[in-house]
């Protein structure tokens, strides 16, 4: 049984939902129902059937998160480079500064290789002084392995407002997780931010 702490980093489950069939290989997807026009459109929307596969045979990861960027109007973007293994290990000690009440948007850049990635989600749990203050998730979608015609995927999240007011100001710790429909965690990292009166 998973602990409450483990569930903090997984998306909320939809009661009664389960994957309808086991994973299939890329070749099986590409050859499936070749005469079904709607399925061909669906496969094309996933990126199947076009371009040279860029999967690295020496890297077994299916989803490689390249970066996470925070954009806020009138400010230069702040990017967390996650492209190298272990790059995320120092983020907790280097807090971001966010102005209270500021509008911001997060943007994730990532690569997919070897197989279709189904139901990728971003889950973020934020704590202040050890108490969870929020848990949010954003569905990123399903993706085929990257090709030379689509070398990287970029997903822009919904715009958010930073909390405001004297009580909201202070230091926060966050855990961000990229997880798929199979509950496989592709990346999890801790980071921190400070809500302040000014940038």
Model feature map: region roles:
Residues 1-151, 158-199:
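N-terminal onset of structured domains
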